[in-house]
Amino acid sequence: MCDKCKGKFYITTPIYYPSDKLHIGHTYCTVATDAMARYKRLQGYDVCFLTGTDEHGQKIETRAKETGVTPKAFVDHIVEGEKGVKDLWKLMNISYDRFIRTTDSYHVSAIQKIFKEMYEKGDIYKGTYEGMYCTPCESFWTASQLKDGKCPDCGREVQPAQEEAYFFRLSKYAGAVRDLLVNTDFLEPRSRVNEMVNNFIDPGLEDLCVSRTSFTWGIPVDFDPGHVVYVWVDALFNYLTALGFRNDRYEDYDKYWPADVHFVGKEIVRFHSIVWPAMLMSMGLPLPKKVFGHGWLLLDGGKMSKSKGNVVDPYLLAERYGTDALRFFLLRTFPFGSDGNFSNEALIGCINTDLANDLGNLVSRTVAMTHKYFGGRLPAAQEGREEQDGDLLAMVGSLRGQYEEQMEKYAFQNALAQIFAVVSRANKYIDENEPWRLAKDETQKPRLARVLYNLLETIRVCAGLLRPFMPATTDEIMKRLGGAPSDWESLGLWGRLPAEVAVEQGPALFPRIDVEQELQALEQLHSAPPALEEDPLPEPLPEITFDVFEKVEMTVVKVLACEKVKKSEKLLKFQLDDGTGTPRQILSGIAKYYEPEALVGKTLVAVTNLAPRKMMGQLSCGMLLSAERGDKLKLLMLDDGIQPGSRLV
């Protein structure tokens, strides 16, 4: 840790479930976490900001099968692919220090060790689970916890589940967890405490199912291979494994743990405020200092959900209005601890009012007047007037302290309100002092210079405090102010701009938007089908004669069996019915794109008169036909009514 650092600050988002592209709700939480991390860095803290993806579970296994690819290929595309999770965070200027994927090998081995430790301690035991399961939420429920017979979190149907499973003795820690919630500020907002105690703890905390046998896409329980670790155990310990706990990938556990705050959506507060501390107690580990459960962004009064399809695409909004405008809107408009209704009208109104009219106008007018009246550089001779300047200077002088008070409570909306109260006062200060009138009187030039200096210094402080929310905008404003100081200390002091400050002009920071036209354009964008982004066509091959083509024998085949080839990441081995009565074996390099069991029973096309060849020591008698475009590969599949052995002519 550096000598000048105030201390460490470890902050996390939840790790997101990549069953589909992320939406504006995920972006909201991540932008808030990023703003807090940037604020703490601005203050001089040694910050570790962790985010990532929770990649195991039944829902992803099911989605991958539906898509016809392996679960790993499925999550790789969502996380690493074009406009995936990492691309979105890059677009949104998210300054995370570490990104964890629960499929990372160091995390997998660490979770197996942790699971075994709790088992050997007696806090995990084997039993039989009987109850209800919500696949979209990856949550188990008892009958008494259901709401109108449905999942109390998402309102969707639940399915009965009965299987052999391992359980965590959550009931053992009910008293300790209750005391933690009731008698400390571990969980905020306080309303979440009442919900957890009244709905989950006091009715009787039951032991938690922590393994599954009905699907395979998870971390295997290494001492009982038929079981995979239940997704929430796998997910929660990411906050430790990403620091090097029970692995040698990193060495930051002692440096950063315990976490200063976990930011999570209110739908997963139960896991973070009840299950997570109980498991840490079982392991004898320090608890995080705080869990903050933020509200939802609602659309038409309901929660956004990937599985419901009622989501807002942050990519579209950020590319259309700018990253900083979207970041600002999310944290200026919605109280972080409460639900908020998202609308295009609110977004455009926020950009026009706060960013174009207030902040943008203040910067452009002040810089333009400095150029117009003083050629872009203020003179040293300036005349201050307490009765006219005092109110603005007092507001700026107290701003950092008021802002800090709100930021420490994660009240981002209030912190921004403090800044924009000063911005509004500065715009009023222009009207009160009428620089255009002062410019007409040569004897008033010192007074004019001081008015403009006061405005530029106000802009410096406000822009500096906006950095956690709009980092690129702050950089641009400071550039226009001649590289003005914006470190934390300087933002609490008046007069850090030199008297003879030189400024430079630039385009409007946030041009005004025509509300009616823009709403119509957005409506069309949302209603139009997405444009397909196609890979380029492959280069054509040299011509062949018809006589050559006639020599290729293409036969309809049906998949009898399919399995992965050992020690190969690419090959699948097929046993095929080709109509001859003897199964034909073909090896095909499509393991990245398909689960073997998903292909059994499918009707395909094979070239059956190719000379046999060995691949990975096994004989392949032919080739399956597939279509290739860019990095995508799909098998040619036919209607199941076509009999094996039929020839393509």
Residue ranges and their predicted role:
Residues C2-F74, I100-F115, E120, C137, ...:
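N-terminal catalytic cores of NTP/NDP-binding nucleotidyl/phosphoryl-transfer enzymes
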Residues C2-T51, Y106-A110, C154, P160-K372, ...:
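Structured secondary-structure scaffolds
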Residues F74-Y133:
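A broadly conserved sequence feature marking short terminus-proximal activation segments
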Residues M92-F99, Y119-M132, S144-Q145, Q159-A161, ...:
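Short secondary-structure capping/junction motifs at helix and strand boundaries
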Residues K121-A174, R178:
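Cys/His-rich short segments
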Residues K126, T333, S338, A346-E383, ...:
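Helix-rich, typically C-terminal accessory recognition domains appended to large enzymatic cores
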Residues I477-V548:
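Intrinsic disorder at enzyme termini
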Residues P530-V649:
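Phosphate-backbone binding interfaces of nucleic-acid-interacting proteins
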